[in-house]
Amino acid sequence: MPELPEVETVRRELEKRIVGQKIISIEATYPRMVLTGFEQLKKELTGKTIQGISRRGKYLIFEIGDDFRLISHLRMEGKYRLATLDAPREKHDHLTMKFADGQLIYADVRKFGTWELISTDQVLPYFLKKKIGPEPTYDEDFDEKLFREKLRKSTKKIKPYLLEQTLVAGLGNIYVDEVLWLAKIHPEKETNQLIESSIHLLHDSIIEILQKAIKLGGSSIRTYSALGSTGKMQNELQVYGKTGEKCSRCGAEIQKIKVAGRGTHFCPVCQQK
């Protein structure tokens, strides 16, 4: 599943290439992906201009005209690509925005991705309802004190809690494993057992890993690419997908276990319970 760095990379590519484009038409071969109704979306957005592309956590937000926002979630394997108007349709192409000189195509092998059309004034309530946590930056949004308070009030295991998106936005399986390795925290550690120095290191590790991944264009693992461009973060991963290899920090063998049903990679020496 694309995580925050991959979605941000897609956002930046879309921003460079489609902002300012007028939507001539919208087509769907699998209209059920539009949760708010394809016909309404087609009616409201045809003829409108894409004014910007923003992001909240793993969600892309197409800013179209003044009145509407199109919320896109890539889920497991969704991806966008740009093509010429005469490009042949491919097997897993499901949604298309056509412009005067090209088209933006959304393809999804598993059909899990979604589009939702909401009014501009409903964007904030939309994400408040989903309880998406703060963005992982050093500004006031990702407040370390509030982060610490939430961890200390919970008996949840740290990995599944980070995956919930309520503590901080955008973390998925790959980067949670990387963050916990960097912070030297066992993925099954109960959050109320974390000492203050560990929480501080965890807070900063989340920011460091995700910002580094954004800088490197995300991790191109399995099917991910950002409009055809591959990322480089996969070359920097320390534990994810490294089962049986030596930890770069201590030399111990990286292990893989299941935590809350998710494959989890960690160093048994650096990340002790």
UniProtKB/Swiss-Prot annotation:
Binds 1 zinc ion per subunit. Gene3D superfamilies: 1.10.8.50, MutM-like, N-terminal (3.20.190.10). It catalyses: Hydrolysis of DNA containing ring-opened 7-methylguanine residues, releasing 2,6-diamino-4-hydroxy-5-(N-methyl)formamidopyrimidine; 2'-deoxyribonucleotide-(2'-deoxyribose 5'-phosphate)-2'-deoxyribonucleotide-DNA = a 3'-end 2'-deoxyribonucleotide-(2,3-dehydro-2,3-deoxyribose 5'-phosphate)-DNA + a 5'-end 5'-phospho-2'-deoxyribonucleoside-DNA + H(+). It comes from the Bacteria. A zinc finger (FPG-type) spans 238-272. Residues 58-76, 162-172 are annotated as: DNA-binding. GO terms for molecular function: 8-oxo-7,8-dihydroguanine DNA N-glycosylase activity; class I DNA-(apurinic or apyrimidinic site) endonuclease activity; damaged DNA binding; zinc ion binding. Its EC number is 3.2.2.23, 4.2.99.18. Keywords: DNA damage, DNA repair, DNA-binding, Glycosidase, Hydrolase, Lyase, Metal-binding, Multifunctional enzyme, Zinc, Zinc-finger. DNA binds at H92, R110. GO terms for biological process: base-excision repair. Its cofactor is Zn(2+). Involved in base excision repair of DNA damaged by oxidation or by mutagenic agents. Acts as a DNA glycosylase that recognizes and removes damaged bases. Has a preference for oxidized purines, such as 7,8-dihydro-8-oxoguanine (8-oxoG). Has AP (apurinic/apyrimidinic) lyase activity and introduces nicks in the DNA strand. Cleaves the DNA backbone by beta-delta elimination to generate a single-strand break at the site of the removed base with both 3'- and 5'-phosphates. Monomer. This is Formamidopyrimidine-DNA glycosylase. The gene is mutM.
